[in-house]
Amino acid sequence: TATHLLHLELRNMLGDHAMQKGSLVDESYFRFDFSHHNAISRDLLEKIEQNVNATILKNILLNEKTNVSISDAEEMGALMLFGEKYDEKVRVVQFGESKELCGGTHVGSTSEIGLFKIVSESSVASGIRRIEARTGISAFNLLNASYQKSRNLETLLKTKDISSAINKLLNDNKNLETKNQKLEKESLSNLIN
């Protein structure tokens, strides 16, 4: 179900060309390959993720139609994957605006997904991008581990503003390197003279 919600958001945000090209799905992790030529910005990925989570929170019930003819499914506006082979009778799975032909397993309502977190976005071939994501408790565990790392950094750096503290450390390090190079040159110059 989460792949369907992601697919809908990709098409809404990137355009109708963003069609599914493959996927691997298990209960807490999935990867989703789709057609698109450019990397997706972090800001846009966050917006896509927010929209998928907003849909999850709406608790939209599964609307499933079985034994539907291909022509009836087309008439209903169900998304069909180009090049995919379908039987004469198909299953249409709908969650709100998302309506696709599908033979996969689905939740009874979107809220059963719990949480959706994009882990990565990358290129897998020319014109094909991949999003890897986690759902449910796996997504929660990932976010919790990240939160714990942030807390540990706050303790180590003695600040809540981790970015500023790291920038200060990097600048201090750069200044020390510059001073060190200057001292090495002076020392070498003194040895020669």
Stretches with model-predicted labels:
Residues 1-34:
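Active/ligand-binding-proximal structured segments within catalytic/core domains
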Residues 17-19, 27, 113, 117-193:
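Terminal appendage regions of diverse proteins
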Residues 3, 7-11, 49-53, 132:
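Short, well-ordered alpha-helical packing segments
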Residues 4-6, 32, 92, 104, ...:
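Divalent metal-coordination and catalytic microenvironments
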Residues 34-124:
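Non-catalytic interaction/regulatory segments
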Residues 1, 38-46, 140-144:
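Ordered, soluble secondary-structure elements with a strong preference for glycine-centered loop motifs
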Residues 2, 6, 106, 138, ...:
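Alpha-helical hydrophobic packing sites
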